[in-house]
Amino acid sequence: MKHLAKLFVVTALSLQAGFVMAQSYPSKPITIVLGFPPGGALDIIARQIAPKMSSDLGQPVVVENKPGAGGVIGMQSVARAEPDGYTVFMGTMGNFSITPVLNKDLPYNVQKDFAPITQVASSGFVLYVNNQLPVKNVAELIAYAKANPDKMNFSSSGNGGLPHMAAEMFNSAAGIKMTHVPYKGSAPSVQDLIAGQVQLTFEAVAIGLPHVQSGKLRALATTGSQRLGVLPDVPIVAETIQGFSVTNWFGMAAPAKTPAERINRLQKAVADALKQPDVKQKLAQLGVEPVADSPAQFGAFIQTETNRWAKVIRDANIKM
């Protein structure tokens, strides 16, 4: 009897300790690591939700930029962090689904070394064209590209990035062959588009919209499944090419083996942050839609997107 009583007490204390540990999270600041420098859409979104998460969790939530190698450095640092819920990674679709296909020598495995938390938000791209290009819509663009195969060049912010992938998917879907001209970043890519050195590019809303508003570029179409609120009169590519859809998305993940209850607590904090009116307004200005799906849904989505882009990369014979 004494042995059973002692066993009961030990078991009860263990359960209580586990309960207290779960209830005490978080007990110190949480760091959201980004693989890119400040100023981009990813950084803006992270800094919008961080203070809201802090209020919800009762601890500071700090955004830390660790740029380099297209996000690999930041992602690697989180893969090696303690799986305790205090260090998480927030990155782009490229980090989770394109880079792993293009680079087989990554110092981590997205599927094995990370625990998905949530897809934070998503955004369609915009097909921007030079003002001198004699086309008014996607159908005319395709016809012009077929009639002038040697005159059609598209720019991108770099080889293997989403703007490059979007244009290659457009090439394939439209049955055309435009030439890729990669740049070191979005700014020089767009500047040469304005100057007429290239004919078109696929880019984020925030990158090209000011130039559309100033009359330097034209927004021919957007790449999501529905029209953007900031460009309501601009059609989607899918109105001409059925099924065409390219969205950039932003997701959050923790090191593998992070306790499930902490993953779920972080997901809830992100979801609640995205419901705040000021956050929704700021995201809308960027042409970004909040998502906040479950960890399981996000994990499945990463795999689906990886498979999808692997086919695009294979069909276009894209190499790093």
What feature does the model see in each segment?
Residues A17-F19:
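N-terminal signal peptide c-region/cleavage motif recognized by signal peptidases
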Residues R80-Y86, M93, V101-P188, V237, ...:
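Hinge/capping helix and adjacent helix->loop/strand transition within the periplasmic-binding protein
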Residues S27-P29, Q213, A260-M320:
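An extracytoplasmic/periplasmic, membrane-proximal ligand-sensing/linker region
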Residues P188-S245:
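Anionic-ligand binding region
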Residues A22-K112, D150-N153, N159, G175-L200, ...:
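N-terminal (or domain-start) structured segment
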Residues M1-V9, L15:
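Bacterial N-terminal signal peptides that target proteins for export
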Residues K2-H3, S24, K28, K52-D56, ...:
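Short hydrophobic alpha-helices and adjacent helix-cap/hinge residues
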